[in-house]
Curated annotation (Swiss-Prot):
Coiled coil: none annotated. GO terms for cellular component: CAF-1 complex; chromosome, telomeric region; ESC/E(Z) complex; nucleus; NuRD complex. The modification N-acetylalanine is found at A2. The keyword DNA repair applies. It holds the Pfam family WD40. This is Histone-binding protein RBBP4. The lineage of its organism: Eukaryota, Metazoa, Chordata, Craniata, Vertebrata. There is a cross-link at K4 (Glycyl lysine isopeptide (Lys-Gly) (interchain with G-Cter in ubiquitin)). It is found in: Nucleus; Chromosome, Telomere. There is a cross-link at K4, K160 (Glycyl lysine isopeptide (Lys-Gly) (interchain with G-Cter in SUMO2)). Belongs to the WD repeat RBAP46/RBAP48/MSI1 family. WD repeats lie at residues 32-125, 126-175, 176-223, 225-270, 271-314, 315-371, 372-404.
Length: 425
């Protein structure tokens, strides 16, 4: 009986999702300056823009690159580098180019040929997460379904993978007992990599100190303060010895690598009422960070007084799995997760007065809801070179590259012609 009910609920939910997506598609010309929808061969659990951009002479587009992965059903997995052509501001831009069938829009007409897979490298199992090293973006670390963290220099691998499926990482980092997701390169110390694991620990490696012939590197330090699965870890962006971690024990911990005590963090705070899945330090303000949780909220913190939560962002309907500050605006952050939505928030609008109609759509700090995905969003990344451009990937193989309409983040349109959900006002 329960099975029948579940099947009925699933069918109803699918109908609702499809209806919502139709409405979203109809409204994209008003909500976005750019939407590119691309179906990957396999879903990617990870997405990160590489820092480089090419601007070909005489062309009306620039070329950007992304690090992706695969999550296959028992077939060979790959670490993937893809290129994306984004239209320049002066590209022929016309809302009538919107292709309602494809859900693509933004000057370009069709996206075919605008997104290409450039490099595929054999990988052991799915790529839980892949992140490039800031000091040398050719070097990419990956989290696997095993306890190993792998490091690849993609310039040393052919762009077409060996058909044997053999995975040959340049380094294999040991120290964990289980898999995980969290991964963070130190932006101030080249080669210092942190990883979070289901085994309740955080490992630190220094790959700059690796002997030339050694392929296996043991963790330099293992941090053991959490009492449950560690979901995410992140270096502070300015202080080379500080990092934060979050876990299923509902805690946010701040660590200092100069401390001799690897089982006790400098600070530990009960951050949420459920598992904490992600964290992000603000790139402009050295004391500010955000955490995202299974309690459906994003919390804002000040390192100078962690006893007090600065703010709680509430609008998500389900678990939050990723939170990232904008690289271009210190008050802007985004969050995504199981509810298929990516929310963009603006701290500067906290506490603003709202009409009752506006309040129904969400709090004043909720700037935009990206409603283009019809499955859980696994990861997203702000483009470092094009403000307001985001790449998001979902569990149903869909990758979207999009940019909200300028009148939404530039307050020149006080009337607010369209509300953030895209239902029109």
């Amino acid at each position: 009986m329960a099975d029948k009910e579940a099947a009925f609920d699933d069918a109803v939910e699918e109908r609702v999702i499809n209806e919502e997506h139709k409405i979203w598609k109809k409204n994209t010309p008003f909500l976005y300056d750019l939407v590119m929808t691309h179906a990957l061969e396999w879903p990617s659990l990870t997405a990160q823009w590489l820092p480089d951009v090419t601007r070909p002479e005489g062309k009306d587009f620039s070329i950007h690159r992304l690090v992706l992965g695969t999550h296959t059903s028992d077939e060979q997995n790959h670490l993937v580098i893809a290129s994306v052509q984004l239209p320049n501001d002066d590209a022929q831009f016309d809302a009538s180019h919107y292709d309602s069938e494809k859900g693509e829009f933004g000057g370009f007409g069709s996206v075919s040929g605008k997104i290409e897979i450039e490099i595929k490298i054999n990988h052991e199992g799915e790529v839980n997460r892949a992140r490039y090293m800031p000091q040398n973006p050719c070097i990419i670390a990956t989290k696997t379904p095993s306890s190993d963290v792998l490091v690849f220099d993609y310039t040393k691998h052919p762009s077409k993978p060996d058909p044997s499926g053999e995975c040959n990482p340049d380094l294999r980092l040991r120290g964990h007992q289980k898999e995980g997701y969290g991964l963070s390169w130190n932006p101030n110390l080249s080669g210092h990599l942190l990883s979070a694991s289901d085994d309740h620990t955080i490992c630190l490696w220094d790959i700059s100190a690796v002997p030339k012939e050694g392929k296996v590197v043991d963790a330099k330090t293992i941090f053991t303060g959490h009492t449950a699965v560690v979901e995410d870890v992140s270096w502070h962006l300015l202080h080379e010895s500080l990092f934060g971690s979050v876990a299923d024990d509902q805690k946010l911990m701040i660590w200092d690598t100069r401390s001799n005590n690897t089982s006790k963090p400098s600070h530990s705070v009960d951050a949420h009422t459920a598992e904490v899945n992600c964290l992000s330090f603000n790139p402009y303000s050295e004391f500010i960070l955000a955490t995202g949780s299974a309690d459906k909220t994003v919390a804002l913190w000040d390192l100078r007084n962690l006893k007090l939560k600065l703010h709680s962002f509430e609008s998500h309907k389900d678990e939050i799995f990723q939170v990232q500050w904008s690289p271009h605006n210190e008050t802007i952050l985004a969050s995504s997760g199981t509810d298929r939505r990516l929310n963009v928030w603006d701290l500067s609008k906290i506490g603003e007065e709202q009409s009752p109609e506006d309040a129904e759509d969400g709090p004043p700090e909720l700037l935009f809801i990206h409603g283009g995905h019809t499955a859980k969003i696994s990861d997203f990344s702000w483009n470092p070179n094009e403000p307001w451009v985001i790449c998001s990937v979902s569990e149903d193989n869909i990758m979207q590259v999009w940019q909200m309409a300028e009148n939404i983040y530039n307050d020149e349109d006080p009337e607010g012609s369209v509300d953030p959900e895209g239902q029109g006002s």
